[in-house]
Amino acid sequence: MKRDLRSQNHEPLNCAEKSDIPYLIVYIFEPKLIQHHDTSLRHLQFIYNSIIELNKILNKKERFVDVFYGEAKNVFQFLMNEFEVKNVFSYQESGIQISWERDRLISKMFQRKGVSWKEFQRDGIIRGIKNRDQWRKKWHQIMRSPIVFNDYSVSKQVELNHPFKLPAELKTKLEDYPMEYQPAGEFNAW
């Protein structure tokens, strides 16, 4: 999971489900991104509480988002040591330079390990383009693409014991979500 924390109209989750192999749903709180000046506690709280709300939906199908705290490279190296990872499905990141550099590093690692990483576009941002030629046409294609209706099979997701737990102090801060903030979760979207 990257920025889109919904159970519906989620193309990467749809592809994972249709791949007909067991899969994990992972969200990584990355220290480098957390420490970046663009990141606020309020944003992190919204993400964390959106994951809690998403898990309420996924739990009905015995699935959940497994939360990790660590750099993506280390988390994926751990996962590849624990499992035979064949595919990774995610949305294309549209964030800051650090996330761009991270994704290039992860892409190279996946290529070396023979892992197919399919990134889906979720908005009008196209990473790495040299110019805006054809941008309008591509934007319209994405905006006109059909809505994805996710359907999840009941499948007991592996509860993985991993060393990437949220630090207790951070977890406490994330759980302390002020009532006056917009409620988290896809059913509370404005």
Report each predicted region and the residues it spans.
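Glycine/tryptophan-enriched, flexible segments
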Residues: 115, 134-190
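Trp/Phe/Arg-rich N-terminal binding region typifying the photolyase-homology
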Residues: 1-154
